Curated annotation (Swiss-Prot):
Glycans are attached at N43. It holds the Pfam family Kazal_1. The keyword Glycoprotein applies. Gene3D superfamilies: 3.30.60.30. This is Ovomucoid. GO terms for molecular function: serine-type endopeptidase inhibitor activity. It comes from Leipoa ocellata (Malleefowl). It is found in: Secreted. GO terms for cellular component: extracellular region.
């Protein structure tokens, strides 16, 4: 199981750093910040599928 530590999120500003992650919703998130904000909005139902683009 691949995991990402999302403690400290959500945050209001994310960098534009490109380190893509693929979520369980089959959506590519540009970086950990964007992914973790989406996890927070989903109340924890969104999980990491794998690192890299979907």
């Amino acid at each position: 199981v691949v995991t990402v530590d999302c403690s400290g999120y959500p945050t209001h500003a994310c960098t534009l750093e490109l380190k893509p992650l693929c979520g369980s919703d089959n959506q590519t998130y540009s970086n950990k910040c964007g992914f973790c904000n989406a996890v927070a909005q989903s109340n924890g139902t969104l999980t990491l599928s794998h690192f890299g683009k979907c």
